[in-house]
Amino acid sequence: MRNKILLFLLTFIGISQIAAASAVRDKYNFNAEWLLYVGDIPEAKEVRFQDADWKKVTLPRPFNEDEAFRLSIEQLTDTVMWYRKHFRLPAGSKNKKVFVEFEGVRQGADFYINGEYIGLHENGAMAVGFDLTPYIKYGQENVMAVRIDNNWNYKERATGTKYQWSDRNFNANYGGIPKNVWLHVTDKVYQTLPLYSNLKTTGVYIYAEDIRVKSRKAVVHAESEIKNEYNRDKKVAYKVEVLDRDGKSIKSFEGTQTVVKPGETATLEASAEIDGLHFWSWGYGYLYTVKTSLWVDGRKVDEVATRTGFRKTRFGRGMIWLNDRVIQMKGFAQRTSNEWPGVGMSVPAWLSDYSNGLMVEDNANLVRWMHITPWKQDIESCDRVGLIQAMQAGDAEKDREGRQWEQRTELMRDAIIYNRNNPSILFYECGNESISREHMIEMKAIRDKYDPHGGRAIGSREMLDIREAEYGGEMLYINKSKHHPMWAMEYCRDEGLRKYWDEYSYPYHKNGEGNNSFRSAMTNKVQKKVDARAYNHNQDSFTIENVIRWFDYWRERPGTGDRVSSGGVKIIFSDTNTHYRGVENYRRSGVTDAMRIPKDPFYAHQVMWDGWVDIENPRIHIVGHWNYKEDVVKPVYVVSSAEKVELFLNGKSLGNGQRDYHFLYTFKDVAFVPGKLEAVGYDKNGKECCRAELQTAGKPEQIKLSVIQNPKGWKADGADMVLLQVEVMDKDGRRCPLANDLIHFDVEGPAEWRGGIAQGKDNYILSKDLPVECGINRALIRSLTTPGAVRITAKADGLQSAEISLSSAPVEVKNGLSDYIPGDELEGRLTRGETPLTPSYKDTKVDVNILSAVAGANQDEAIKSFDDNELSEWKNDGRLNSAWITYSLERAARVDEICMKLTGWRLRSYPLEIYAGDELIWSGETEKSLGYIHLNVKPVLTNEITIRLKGASKEGDGFGQIVEVAAPAAGELDLFKAKNGDKTNHELRIVEIEFKENLWQ
């Protein structure tokens, strides 16, 4: 108790005492003491409007948070609402500049201060700022009012143009002010804010050049846009100080003094070499604070602290380098809303770290935020946890022209300016569908103007043949390149509810059972009598599918030849309140549920992704649980990166598993016996390298409560939350994996129950009666603005109850302002350590290059079968006697593997014969795939290989449940959307072919 009191007092002292405005610059938390009204009252802009009966809220707070995961995305309420705030500036603010920064509003917003209209912001995605100085009443109360319309069909007022990304499929409409708001008070000589929307300013830019990773050196540059709003010239000195993560100053330097005329904007710069640097990396969120200050007449008048990191990047030869080490992209395409049940996207900064940090714990190195610019809080979170980001601006499924394209370029410009100091962003993405070469060049020019030194690649989805793109990649399919890197923007759309273990245990869900219809993402209409099995998995089959799909990218990793895949991102990390195809009214493709409780695929990816390219740490995971009825006989699946896996039941060996897709081991017909099930992995030398076990749990006896919270303590600011975890345990403290008990919760004290999610009516959103699923569940509890003790009790029929006590610490708010900036107290995580200096992969294959080709038809197009362009192909004329092509190799070689991408890869099986000179080295039918196939051929020394069709191809989609979102388009070589794509005759069609020699280790 004494320690709790001491922590309480220290926290109070640390975040209290809002002093008078400082001599330089103040940033205030502007989230407190807002008032919310749902409905349109034009008079609400007036200062004297009576708002005493409005709902009191702390931002960030969407007006419709109660609907998150209760309603499907297209049903989320859209309407007009007003937010109002009363505040006073601290003493000493007079004659200073005052700016307000909104990290984002949804959708279109009109802003008023003291009854005066100050501006409009409409894109619903990016931050916006306003200069309040002309309207502020110093020493008096000020009133800010914001009218917001989150209509799904909101159109830009000036042009009547709808924003492409205001979409009912992917952009969950949590309307109002769902992000943070800050107030800045500065001198009249000041560094601008990076808020191009409305203010037209670019702020501070920090970057490093001449990075030498091994010697830990780099030249650090600081650049600030400044303004002089005095009525006389000011001679301004520019100074820079760099502090390490512990706050220790490691370097100070300065630029030349500059005379800035009244009303003038100038850019000041300084740079210096710094040694002993720690470079930001995957799982290594090492961040520095760079303080840039302005000095006039020997006095500091302005200072901006920028938290950033330094890292080295390179993009080329189909690969990506981070700090001189090749890294294959492994991660998730996550909805930008990154939402939670009962609150939507508006969670405290520490909870963003928890969620994004789980991706790193899952051995993901990349998150691709889909369609819309991510929230600044998530961007900064990824900096801290060491998670690479691909930053979207705003789009939907198509390239656009006219005003809609201009909206996209403007948003990209604003997003780059706002986020260019965040080291975790390595990619700027210009579209969720291929854009034209001209548009790619235009976007690239924006990057070059506003972030020329950030070490970031700019590209778009696909871009398979546009060399101006610096990266690209399709959805669902596998791409390879020896030019700009290709990584899959989205793969494995399958869905599975966490509750469903398998068909052998409660609730006995057979794979695929559920609906036979789903809502189309293109038409928003229900498609009936469709195969929806892939969207109603149990956890066994969901895990297997995730293993199979990743294997496609792992097989093409760096080290397997000249043309490689740079990996891919699985859709999605956590279940999401967006477009779905399964039974529930939300998408369950996540490897965690919406409360971030892991499903089995979470652990499968942890196994498969533990390395920069090659596996560096062998792991093993047994899929499922070990609690069944005595007569159950079932397959046991193990995911492991070991070379061999042996299964033991109560110490008795059940033999070695059948290995498929490199990572999946199957043990058929295992009879259940209570006790301990162990899987042991062995390396290539037969030495044990990893081990996992499952234990049979006993009868459910008791409830266990635990809490996940801010590492700096729970804050009574009306926005902070704790994540309450509830488990059902046996008498020995083992979780009961089949428990589905309904738990009733009571909360006493200053806190608000926001709840969790479970299968049932309204998904149990906000309900204090919440069942566990597979023995576990979680709920969110939000603080109020009153600090104090909170007690939570949990009860269920037939189980021993549990309770837990918490305490929230006070946060001082004075006149609507607070010094407490939640993200500033959170530290970078260094869990994976610094970038290793060793190579990330070993070459396992080498290519035998092609000199030329002779074909039975269309000779002039034969080169297209080996031109590193997946949008081109060679094909014959449809006659069997012309269905052949002979390749001349650069050297005589014993080719033992042929890798091909054949047109119609998911629809067609080609009956082929392959010859080395005159000797037959392979004969058979090719498998259907999502891109490339690999044929193991008889190695014969030759410098000439012929591919010949020996009959009509067999048709039929091999991946009927894998469907695209975009509308049909002609000319796509998968032929999936092509008219008569399954009518083959005697066509031989090759997109790309590679001849390989394996380097046996």
Feature names for model-found ranges:
Residues D51, K55-P60, I113, E825-V895, ...:
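Disordered, acidic Ser/Thr/Pro-rich linker "stalks" and the adjacent N-terminal cap
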Residues D610-P635, K644, C689, L694-L723, ...:
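Short S/T/G/P-enriched beta-strand
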